[in-house]
Amino acid sequence: MEKKKRRWGDRKDGVLLRDLDGMHFITPLIYPNRCDNEAYIRETIDLTNMNAYLKKKNESETEFPYTMFHIIVAGLVKTITLRPKMNRFIANKNFYQRNEVSMSFVVKKQFADEAAEALAVIHAKDESNVESIHEDLRHQILDCKDVHKVDSSTDNMDFFNHMPRFLGKFLVWILTRLDIHGWIPASIIETDPYYTTCVISNLGSIKLNCGYHHLTNWGTCSVFCIIGEKSKRPVYHEDGTIEMREMLDLGLTIDERLVDGYYYSKTIRLLKKLLENPELLETPANQEVEY
């Protein structure tokens, strides 16, 4: 994304939108809280082509095999790069365009009740594609799974947890004030998952069906994506035949104040096209596709 000279009113992580229409100017003034403006979208993805694509990619990639999760992350990156209004956020009743496309997710260090979790963030570029994102995910996931390492977000939370309770509450209150005005430290913006474009939760990896996750008034994240558990379902063809195919549900929670329903509809159509035709993700994120 092209960097612009920072002007008065801009934030470290976003550019103030100064040319909004009247409706979008008024909306955050009368509906100021992100969590009060959640909308929910569910989309079903046919995994036939993705499964074949993964099989082909993993013929040569054995050390860190490509997975469905990697394809979905790459699909979200390309979708939001091509649909930039999805990368807006509202803070202090103002609209901002985020400076970059970023994704965050939780990594379970081990599949055990008492195992710790780590928070991972990837920062995409206009030229990012499925291969470069796969490499970013490799570094992030392997680093997070190291039981001897603590990610910076978790380390910060532990720091507050070890303080006297009254002091921790006071400092967090200070941070919420800074958050409102965009004065939060850059180190937090870089590593806090709720300052990213989209938070992704792969519930299917722990055998849960697709659901929805709330947004938060802390941070700037306007999109949350839940990945469900894949399953076989009937597909009915026009000639009357029935075929069982592997399907996947995605549950998206979005800030409905950002754009209108038509923009969201076209965005979901693009995401579905990319995930059902994953070879398109080998092109740079900013390269247009027909959908």
Predicted regions and their residues:
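C-terminal catalytic/motor cores of large multi-domain enzyme assemblies
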Residues: 1-291
